C-alpha cells in the first residue's frame, strides 16, 4: 500500500480533495451541497502522471493490489490495468471493479483443447509446466524429422518459427520466444484482442 501511495501521489491528492471540499463549503455556490456529496464519495482529487499500471501478481495478491489502487482513485476505466498471464483465472470474470483488465496469454482455444486431452489421458488437470513441455516435445520431434543433428546449431542461430499445439514459437540467435495473444476481461467477459 505504501508503494501505491507513492506512485499515485496519494497524500497530495488526498489533501487536494480536502482543500476542494473546504473551498466549496466556504463558497457561495448554489450547488455546493451536491458538489460536496459527490466529492465525499472520492478518496482523492487530482490527475495521475501515468496511463497504465502493470501489476506483476496473481490470484488474491492481484486482487489485493488492484483493490488498493481503487482506494487511491486509480480506476481501470481511466487507466489500463495490465497484468501477467493469468492462465484464464475464471474468478477474475466476477471482479468487475478491476475491469477492464488486460493480460498476455497463450491461445485460449488451444489451451482448452489441451486441458481436455490431458485430463482424458491422465485423469487430472495439467499444470503450467506440462503445457510448455507439451510443445517442447513437439519441437524436438519436428527438429528430429526435418534436420540432422549436425545442423541443429544452425537452426537455432537463424530465424525460424515453429507452430506448436498451444502457440507459435520464434527461434533466433539460440533463443526461443513464445508468441502470446493479448486478452481483456471486461463486463465479465474474456475478449481476445489479438
Predicted regions and their residues:
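Metal-dependent nuclease catalytic core centered on acidic motifs
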Residues: 57
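Segments of small-molecule ligand-sensing domains
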Residues: 123-134, 141-190
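A small/polar active-site loop signature that marks catalytic segments
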Residues: 35-38
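Extracellular/periplasmic periplasmic-binding protein-like sensory domains
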Residues: 1-33, 48-52, 60-134
Amino acid at each position: 500500500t505504501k508503494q501505491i501511495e507513492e506512485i499515485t501521489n496519494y497524500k497530495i491528492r488526498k489533501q487536494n480533495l480536502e482543500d476542494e471540499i473546504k473551498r466549496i463549503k466556504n463558497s457561495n455556490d448554489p450547488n455546493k451541497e451536491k458538489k460536496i456529496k459527490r466529492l465525499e464519495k472520492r478518496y482523492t482529487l487530482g490527475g495521475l502522471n501515468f496511463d497504465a499500471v502493470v501489476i506483476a501478481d496473481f490470484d488474491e495478491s492481484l486482487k489485493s493490489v488492484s483493490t488498493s489502487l481503487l482506494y487511491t482513485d486509480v480506476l481501470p476505466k481511466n487507466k489500463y490495468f495490465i497484468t501477467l498471464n493469468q492462465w484464464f483465472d475464471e474468478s477474475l470474470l466476477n471482479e468487475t471493479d478491476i475491469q477492464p483488465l488486460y493480460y498476455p496469454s497463450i491461445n485460449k482455444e488451444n489451451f482448452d483443447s489441451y486441458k481436455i486431452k490431458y485430463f482424458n489421458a491422465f485423469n487430472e488437470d495439467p499444470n503450467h509446466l506440462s503445457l510448455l513441455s507439451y510443445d517442447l516435445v513437439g519441437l524436438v520431434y519436428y527438429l528430429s524429422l526435418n534436420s540432422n543433428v549436425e545442423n541443429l546449431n544452425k537452426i537455432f542461430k537463424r530465424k525460424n518459427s515453429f507452430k506448436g499445439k498451444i502457440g507459435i514459437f520464434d527461434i533466433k540467435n539460440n533463443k526461443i520466444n513464445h508468441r502470446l495473444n493479448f486478452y481483456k476481461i471486461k463486463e465479465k467477459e474474456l475478449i481476445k484482442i489479438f
